[in-house]
Structure formats: C-alpha cells, structure tokens
Amino acid sequence: MTRALAGLAAAAAGMLALPAAGQAATTFGSRLNHDPANSGECMRPPNPGPCTLVSFIHPIDPNGDPYSGGAPVSGVITKFRIRAFGEGGAAATVTFRLADISRPDPNNQNSAVATLVVDGPTVTIPASDPMATETPILEFPARVKVSQGNHLALDGTNVWATVNNSGDKFTYVFQPPLVAGQGPRGSTDNAGELLVQADIEPDADGDGFGDESQDQCPSQGTTQGACDNTAPGVSGIAVGARSLRYRLSEAASVTLKVQKARPGRRVRGKCRRQTKANRNRPRCTRWVSVGKSFSDDGDAGANSKNIPRLLRKANLAPGLYRMLITARDAAGNETKRSKRFRVR
C-alpha cells in the first residue's frame, strides 16, 4: 500500500521547498518518480536494526535505462532529495552518505562490495501519513565533496526509501552500517531503487563550497564571500646594515631581491645592456639582481627580516642599489615596491 508524508511535518522539520536545479548544477540519482514500496530493508528479520543502503543502479531519462556510473562529475553536493517515510508510525532519522561500490563479478547481480567515502547531513524523515495520496519529495541543504564515480547512500533504521518491483537488484544493504576508515565490505542483500537524488555544483577553487549557490568567489579558495581584489599595501621600507624593516596592510608572502644599478640604453621601450650597436640610444638605469632572492612570511603591520650575510651592505661593492619587495596575499594579489640605498 502506498504511504506518504505529512506536508506540515516536513515544513516543521526545516525542509526546503523543491526548486528547479540551477543551470550550473548536475543532478544525479533517482528520478524520484515512484513512491516507496515493499521497502523497509533495515527492519527485516532476523536482525532488524541500522543499516546502510548503497545505490548501485538508477534508471535514467529518457527511457529509464539502468545506469551504474555513480556521480557523473566531481564537485560539491549542495542539496539532496529523498522520497521516503518513517514506518511504524514514527519518524526516521537518516544520514546522507557517499560510497564506492562495485560488483566483483559483473555477471553476478547478487553481491557487491562497498566502501564508505564520506558522511553528509543527518536529517529527520517524518512518519507516514495514511491519509495522503502520495509521498512528497523532501529537499535538504548540504555541503559534501563528491568525486566522479561516487554512489549515493543512506543510513537509517525504520525508513522506507526504496521502491522494489520485478526483482530489481539496484541497491545493496550493508548491516551493520558501513564505517568510515573501514576497508571494503561485501553484501549479498539487495533491494530495488534507492529514492535519493543529489545536485552537484562545480568547485573550481577546491574550497569545498559549491560555486553556484555557496561561493561568491569561485576563483579564490581563501574566501566564499566577495572576491578579494585588493593588493597588499607595502610601506615603511628601511634597509639597515643587517636587517630590513617594512610594513604590510595584510599578511602576505614576501620575496626580496637586492639589485644594483647599471648603465643601459633604452631600446624599444626597455632598458638594455649597452653595446656598440645601441650606444647612441637614450641612457637609462637597469637593475641587475645581486645573489639569490630571499623570502619572508609577512604579517599585517610591522615586519623585520634579517638580510643574508652576502647581501649586507658591508659585503656589497660600492654603488647604488635597491631592495625590491614583492608581496603576494593569499588571494594572489601582488604589490611591488622598492627602496634605494647606496654603498660607499
């Protein structure tokens, strides 16, 4: 007999209305076009109790052909949907999960091997409503990283979340539930289609937030708000006998170079080394690096860095020099500043 969920109970549980998936999202899993039927695998005798339901096959549009490839792309699952209810007049607590699953023998549909990949949100599925005409689709927010090929899974006890007909072997039951860090485990207990669906959004910067609905700046992994396009400010540069002092407006990685002034000639907009061919070109000053560059992890505010021994003033030949500072913040914004000094 078809059972359903109370819409009012769903709203009270904090579930979202079911919107259309955004254009940038990829939806995979069940088409959710059936009510749960002949389900309740976790409560089957002789050992009723918690279990993990791992989907292996889902029918796909347009013709309902069986698909066993799991997630078609990598990214972040930002929402998932379940068509289910709690049996026995009680609400069901379920946990959204991802697993890797395969059939060791492709010709044997009776057994599969699975490994838990990650746990997602734990949510409450209201009890069945015998007066309702169909089971509504429940949608929940999430933020779960997914890799291409991962399969949808659900942990529960008194939950009806599959549709079983015609002997379909689309989902495998693991009892007790799969455990994080545990190796592959086999199962010969199977069921029909798992009524779970998920939306995957791209995650271009790899920060674990969906680029469409959760991340305002998909190009910078250090922020999920507005993009940081402000370069760090560099000021107060002072080159001492043994150390360098400077100030930063924000924390930044700093690269430092000592460069010496050399005479040059301007050729096609650049200051080149003087040669016989360009000796009549306009004069200019070119800066030539001395020794190796060195670096510092600069903090916001005042900073001090020891200068390598070979680059200290006492060990430099007389002439005009500059300290070139390049500061790059966590978002990749860069500022270059220099401070001239003379060695006599």
Regions found by a protein language model. Name each.
Residues 80-84, 243-250, 256, 307:
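Aromatic/hydrophobic beta-strand junction motif of beta-rich domains
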Residues 266-316:
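Glycine-centered tight-turn motifs at strand-turn-strand junctions
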Residues 201-231:
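Extracellular calcium-associated, cysteine-rich motifs in secreted modular proteins
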Residues 211, 334-339:
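Extracellular and select intracellular beta-sandwich modules with Ser/Thr-enriched
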Residues 303, 319-326:
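A short tyrosine-centered beta-strand micro-motif
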Residues 13-23:
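C-terminal segment of classical bacterial N-terminal signal peptides
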Residues 22-115, 121, 129, 141-151, ...:
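Beta-sheet-rich sandwich/jelly-roll-like modules and their strand-loop junctions
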Residues 155-157, 326-330:
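Beta-strand-rich extracellular modules
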